[in-house]
Amino acid sequence: MRLQIKDIKIIDPLQNRDLIGDIFVENGRIVSKFLGDADKVVDGRGKIAVPGLIDIHSHLREPGEERKETIYTGTRSAAKGGITTVFCMPNTKPVIDNAPTVEFVLLKAQKEGLVNVLPIGCATKGSHGVEISEIGVLKKAGIVAVSDDGLPIANSQIMRRTLEYTKMFKLPVISHGEDKELSKNGVMNEGKNSMILGLRGIPKQAEEVIISRDIMLAELTEGYLHIAHVSTAGSVELIRQAKKKSIKVTAETCPHYFTLTDDIVKGYNTNTKMNPPLRRQEDVDAIKQGLADGTIDCIATDHAPHMEEEKNREFDLAPFGIIGFETILSLILNELVDSGVLSLSKALSKMTSNPAKIFNLEGRGTLKEGNIADITIIDMKYSYEFKKENIVSKSKNSPFIGRKFKGGAVMTIVGGNIVWQV
């Protein structure tokens, strides 16, 4: 199909482009122009075209937990949020530690997915932290990184060997920063609020101990380390110092960590329970500073769907996690861009050019001629209330229900095809 987007503001962080013009798409690729008429013309006046957003951390739950989310419902939710590519974590049932499971996810996504789905493979077999997965086989099958997400690799020797082994394949190791002994039985941030609420806390050091260790191992091995869902000021500083030493470390955070504090847990709303937990205001401020100075490279959702009956339990018993596909862009615009923490271009780079570079995604992350036509169209004046009944994810576990937003995705284009529009 030939698609023309007319008179639209184009922002492409990688190419340092910020101009008004037309975008031409033919056979799923961006072209300079084409002869003849377009099959479809989109009026872009008053809107912004950006490279398709890439979410490097999500849980699609398929195979095994389709009652919470499926590849179809998850990618539909992502498309609504302006996301054109999602990475899915391997903690499915069965876990993604073998080629057939990778192939299942890719085939299912090809048949039913609205956006691109790229699997992350288990770093260790069964995510048990004992024996390294057959990473070469997984890479050949189509993974983009390895992780035992949800679990740290507790054995330092295994983590060292994983960093050494994955270096051969230029695959990042995604680290889940949590010392399970320090966080054991904890359900929220350890501090004044946990004492007042009578809830067992998770100290910041549970995250920082593992991040510190993994940075040291990345320095030792010269492997590629990516740190997931950074939530504390101490973690930001550890990563900042590692980058100053030219250690191969990159990092992500999530919107809830630059938007909410553990004060919101006072209502015992289980949709404020996630792992890592919400921290204090000084941590929120440090996350924002880390995004501004480049310490934190990416913003991801950690989209973690759970059924209402699972969340509608005592705070102690409810599972960790919230959904995030449908709110991430608006939260970035409202919390980071509108407040002046980041320019629009720099904010967008956290979900476009930076993830594409870190995870070697050829043809994505920029609107360069010849690239895959994954495009997100934003309307900064688009106002809406995030209502439970309008959520398209199979699960509804979000702390942002009822919040009013200004600015968001109004059209999502994947491979030259319009997969969502307001």
From Swiss-Prot:
Q: What residues bind Zn(2+) 2, as annotated? A: D149, H176, H229
Name its pathway: Pyrimidine metabolism; UMP biosynthesis via de novo pathway; (S)-dihydroorotate from bicarbonate: step 3/3
Which positions in this protein are listed as binding substrate?
H59, L60, R61, N91, N275, H306, F320, G321
What are its GO cellular component terms?
A: cytoplasm
Could you cite one Gene Ontology molecular function of this protein?
zinc ion binding
Q: Which UniProt keywords apply?
A: Hydrolase, Metal-binding, Pyrimidine biosynthesis, Zinc
Cofactor binding description: Binds 2 Zn(2+) ions per subunit.
Which reactions appear under catalytic activity for this entry? (S)-dihydroorotate + H2O = N-carbamoyl-L-aspartate + H(+)
Record keyword Metal-binding present: yes
Q: Which residues form the active site?
A: D302
A biological process (GO) of this protein is: purine nucleobase catabolic process
What are its cofactors? Zn(2+)
| Residues given in the record as Zn(2+) 1 binding sites | H57, H59, D149, D302
User: What Enzyme Commission number(s) apply to this enzyme?
Assistant: 3.5.2.3
| Annotated SUPFAM superfamilies | Composite domain of metallo-dependent hydrolases (SSF51338), Metallo-dependent hydrolases (SSF51556)
Protein family according to the UniProt entry: Belongs to the metallo-dependent hydrolases superfamily. DHOase family. Class I DHOase subfamily.
What is the annotated role of this protein in its UniProt record?
Catalyzes the reversible cyclization of carbamoyl aspartate to dihydroorotate.
| Name the UniProt record assigns to this protein | Dihydroorotase
Question: What is the native source organism of this protein?
Answer: Endomicrobium trichonymphae
What broad taxonomic lineage does this protein's source fall under?
Bacteria, Pseudomonadati, Elusimicrobiota, Endomicrobiia, Endomicrobiales
